[in-house]
Amino acid sequence: MLDVNFLDEKKKDILFADFPQKITSLQWHSYEVQELEKNKDVTLIASSKETKYQIFRYKDNAYGIQFHIEIKDTTVNDWGCVPEYKSALENQLGQGALEKFDKEARDNMNNMNNYSKILYTNFKNDIILIK
């Protein structure tokens, strides 16, 4: 779990304007998009200590979100069933990381699912209806 901090660009963005300045999210990946600074068509919307480009927009056509805003009560354990995933998590965070991660995810699930609803509603109302 990690904190994602929104930048001022959030205020002008049709998908994320309604979000609080900071949200807690689930991130479990080995790769990330980096080094977009030179691309003038990319707008950074949110960042974290771990991943600079947590949320970014390309022009008005596409978004990149490098964390999971959507979870259910079995998400972490479902992923932990994959031996390579569990091993990678424990290599990075230590023995028992899966259980701790699962508890943190469950503790934050209601807020994360509320953020998912906001994102879906904004996408449905503002993106789909505009196009």
Label each region the model flagged.
Residues 71, 76-131:
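Acyltransferase
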